[in-house]
Amino acid sequence: MKVSESWLREWVNPEWDTNTLAEELSLAGLEVDGIEPVAPAFTNVVVAKVISVEKHPDADKLNVTQVDIGADEPVQIVCGAKNVVAGMKACCATVGAVLPGDFKIKKAKLRGVPSNGMLCGANELGLPDDGVDGLHVLPADAPVGTDLREYLDLDDQVIDVDLTPNRADCLSIAGVARDVAAIGNVPFKQPFDNVTVDKSGDCSQSVNVVDAHGCPKYLGCLVDGYDTTAETPSWMKQRIERAGLSPKNLTVDITNYVMLELGQPMHAFDADKLQGDIQVRMAHPNEKLMTLDEKELTLKADTLVIADDNGPVALAGIMGGLNSSVSDTTTRLFFECAHFAPLSIIGKARQYGLHTDSSHRFERGVDAFLPEKALERALQLFTEIAGGRVSNLVAVINELNLHQPKAIQLRPERIVKLLGVEIADNDVEAIFKRLNFKVEQNASGWALTAPSYRFDMEIEADLIEEVGRVFGYNNLPETEVQAPMRLPTLPESEQELYLVRKALVNRGFHEVVTYSFVEETLQQKMMPSIPYLCLQNPISDDMKAMRTTLFPGLLQTISYNQKRQQNRIRIFESGLVFTRYNEETQQTPVIGGAIVGDLNPANWSGENRPVDFYDLKGDVETLLAMSHVQDKVRFEPTEFAIFHPGQSAALILNGQTVGLMGQLHPGLVKSAGVSGKVYLFQMDLATIMETKVPAAKPISKFPEVQRDLAFVVDAELPVQKLLDAIDHVQSDILKAVEIFDIYQGEGIEETQKSIALTLKIQHQDRTLQDEEVDQLIEQVILKAKEQVNAELR
């Protein structure tokens, strides 16, 4: 929100300079991003009138002018501007003036003709571009001799206020002024009288509000018989420009001016272009509308529109249609001033690639009781400038759907609890009265009702924030911390998340943080069987679904980096995923990662290879090795929609799936925007947050026996199944089983494979006997045969 300081000071005028005003606004939560002067420094430039213009005797492109600058005698100025004519009002830098760039005006002779000053264009004074090739033309009623800085209010400053979404009430000069008045405890004064414009004409335009939830209030009236040549006054154009908008024509400028002044967006239709009744309704699927920016839209059924008998004429609260726009030939106007519910506007502008000042305000919320005042103000300005006859008001109001402020209880002890300081009851009441709240004292504190424009007030904490803002956070005394200071401790069996993250960083991963909201279509493709939540008011359509997995965010990060020539990527993220079962929302902490590209960074040896499934499995096993379930988690082949059917596995713990990993399905590579073979994993954090308690154990001093066994098994049998079978052998001397070969080929049937294992056998307290070792080997062979039908090769 760009705020003209001089305009603001017409409403409220604290005894603060510009910098102090900006600082106080920032401390009160209206953060000031910057302060810009409306014009650079220059001196001795006045309003002048060109009396006569004659051609220069020795220069075809120069003119000799006589100029009235408000002195006793006119001055002669040689001028090269193409648009200089007798009778015009212009900006004149007198002798002694200093223009931007330290350009000093002196008496001079141009081609032998004396020149005592300089007639200036807008660019020479550092003023906004007026689109004129030549002199900056001033209004005919500009008083000759007046200092230009005073006449155009060029000592004004534009304060850029960055508002948070909940402070939509400050998207106007009046809104910011209300806060300044409360903060500074100074009077708030409206600089214009509340005038009710005479409405003696008959309104032939009927209005039918079909969707009363989306539009609980619609006001309008016709204006005709006005001066169609009337132009926007320079003071109004100036204020509109300083707010960051461009003047268009009188009608549009007045609606924009009222929006900037009071915060109520408005729209004006060419009444002669409207056919039949105005209807406020939802769009019919695939209806067309050409907007004012000449963009044809195909409307969706969830879009609120203003329509006539021929179809839509405006996107409600967003932008008007070209088919009903006001032009230089318009003789009858229909002014619309409505209240649109935020839920009916949120996201609709972005849905069509639009963002307007109107949608910006309606999305955040506008005072439901402001349209009456705003319409009267617009009609007052219009009739004062252009005259005309105003019809009676057309009003369609559904009181039940209007936001009604509710009383909120405020307790003194809660103020102390949240702000850390006790504020006198009288001061609390004074603060809320300055904020225009209705204050009622009761046994437990106060019942406070916010004014209609403060629809962000919902709970007690909101009220306490207001107390802190207006009292001044910088006025809160410093207090010592009251809580006992002690370092948090974890049981020895629990490990902190940062250790898990550090383990991945040590393996070459980079940590990322992605949004919890993802594209609905992509999520459905990746996890079609998992119920998910959708946001009612998403930031954008591609951030509508709450993630059920970390994979969409990880893949978007990979896509972003691959487009920037980063081909070797190893990333991980820890966070919540959201699912919905039996009408209940579940939030599960998980950790996930992704790898793609070469295994190692480029190095001088030139030896490298692409990552594969087993590289990722090694990363996952590193995390499992930190936990107490390292030996209990099993990797079992399975199929997920997101993974390649032959390159995926589930992590199974006690019969439950606690994680999954695999290669991204080739059919999803394009829609995910990535290239190459991407490998992903995700597991529940709870699985690895409990670790083994370290226990010292002496190393056996006695010889270790190693025996190699090769088993022939079914070719489809996972190796883990064979290892699990051997694990069922009850023995204290079997220390480890390691795979050293898997073979398929000559001597083995096509439907089988050979798995070669090394068994490490050792007793803790004595040397083993051959009989003990042989007995163990027999048990291993027997278990392998019983459980997986393995034959000793």
From Swiss-Prot:
SUPFAM superfamilies: Anticodon-binding domain of PheRS, Class II aaRS and biotin synthetases, Nucleic acid-binding proteins, PheT/TilS domain, Putative DNA-binding domain
Cofactor(s) required, per the database record: Mg(2+)
Family stated for the protein in its record: Belongs to the phenylalanyl-tRNA synthetase beta subunit family. Type 1 subfamily.
Subcellular location: Cytoplasm
Species of the source: Hydrogenovibrio crunogenus (strain DSM 25203 / XCL-2) (Thiomicrospira crunogena)
Enzyme class label: ligase
GO terms, biological process: phenylalanyl-tRNA aminoacylation
Protein name: Phenylalanine--tRNA ligase beta subunit
GO MF annotation list: ATP binding; magnesium ion binding; phenylalanine-tRNA ligase activity; tRNA binding
Substrates-to-products reaction catalysed: tRNA(Phe) + L-phenylalanine + ATP = L-phenylalanyl-tRNA(Phe) + AMP + diphosphate + H(+)
UniProtKB keywords: Aminoacyl-tRNA synthetase, ATP-binding, Cytoplasm, Ligase, Magnesium, Metal-binding, Nucleotide-binding, Protein biosynthesis, RNA-binding, tRNA-binding
Domain tRNA-binding stretches: 39-149
Keyword Protein biosynthesis assigned: yes
InterPro entries: aa-tRNA-synth_II/BPL/LPL (IPR045864), B3/B4_tRNA-bd (IPR005146), DNA-bd_dom_put_sf (IPR009061), Fdx_antiC-bd (IPR005121), Fdx_antiC-bd_sf (IPR036690), NA-bd_OB-fold (IPR012340), Phe-tRNA-ligase_IIc_bsu (IPR045060), Phe-tRNA-ligase_IIc_bsu_bact (IPR004532)
Gene3D superfamilies for this protein: 3.30.56.10, Bira Bifunctional Protein, Domain 2, Ferrodoxin-fold anticodon-binding domain, Nucleic acid-binding proteins, Phenylalanyl-trna Synthetase, Chain B, domain 3
Boundaries of every FDX-ACB domain copy: 700-793
NCBIfam families named among the record's database cross-references: pheT_bact, YtpR
Residue intervals of the B5 domain: 403-478
Quaternary state and interactors: Tetramer of two alpha and two beta subunits.
Keyword Manganese: no
